[in-house]
Amino acid sequence: VLPMPCEGSMVFRVIKTNTKKPLEDIKVTLGGNSNDEDGYAQYATPNYISGSFANEKQERYFLMGKYEVTEAQFNAVMKGEQCPSVNMKTSLPAINMSWFDAVEFTHKYNEWLLKNAADKLPTEDGSKGFVRLPTNAEWEFASRGGVAVDEAAFRENTFPMPDGIARYAWSSKNANGRLQVIGLLEPNPLGLFDTLGNVSEMVFDGFRANKLSRYHGQEGGMIARGGSYIKGESEVNNTSRIEVPYYDNNGAMKKKDMGFRVAITAPLLT
């Protein structure tokens, strides 16, 4: 748990990566089996994952926000001394902000932490961790359940949902057309809430199309993951990577069903 301005806090979950050495990484297959129409965005593609920090057993991990960033958290960081009230409305995921706003949030939050709670940040080899948007690979690895699920479950389009998808993800089928307060449904196997549904989540890196078993060389717009409350159940999954332009005709792109969560990592070469 990290403190926030206005006496708030942000909760993180440990995401182990099955690595034990600082430069070790593991191969993970992300995406899924897809038809030709959307294979450019969803087809299974090899990726690599590693962890920034090590526990007492030398198991390496990174940290992922347990919940989507809320309106109250976003405003507490971005508006400085003007502390927002915390109620049902401000406990909804923060929306209608651009990718650039999300990155600015992480920058301002890091500056606040370094000034007010530097001792609370995790460290690796003397270097303090920092908050940023998760990469596409980090997001999908964590949303699928990481090392908490077996290989067969990891490769499914959704993490294990023994009680049915409506108990784990907000979609057009159960959200009644409304954004929902964070954390009301069941979490995924790593204790992360709402990775699927509610709001789609922006990640740090840009969109690349799949080209057979690799990514295309051109990087395009931003990536939105997980589907949202206005999407059907079939669109709320771990495989879909939706490309969203960074800008529209009015400026930086903002959407009513798009938000973000954050991760904590550390410099690679400390």
Which stretches of residues belong to each language-model region?
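Short, solvent-exposed loop/turn elements at domain surfaces
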Residues: 21-28, 71-73, 211, 232-236, ...
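Short, surface-exposed beta-strand/loop micro-motifs that present aromatic residues
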Residues: 3, 11, 50-55, 189-191, ...
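Disulfide-stabilized, aromatic/cysteine-rich ligand-recognition loop
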Residues: 1, 5, 186-188, 216-270
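Short, polar loop/linker segments at the starts of domains and inter-domain junctions
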Residues: 8, 23-53, 179-185, 236-247
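Functional-site microenvironments in short loops/helix caps that host divalent-cation chemistry
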Residues: 103-238
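Extended N-terminal export/anchoring regions of large proteins
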Residues: 1-9, 14-23, 29, 55
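Active-site microenvironments of metalloenzymes and redox enzymes
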Residues: 28-158, 264-270
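Residue-level detector of short, conserved catalytic/binding motifs and their immediate flanks
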Residues: 13, 60-65, 92, 131, ...
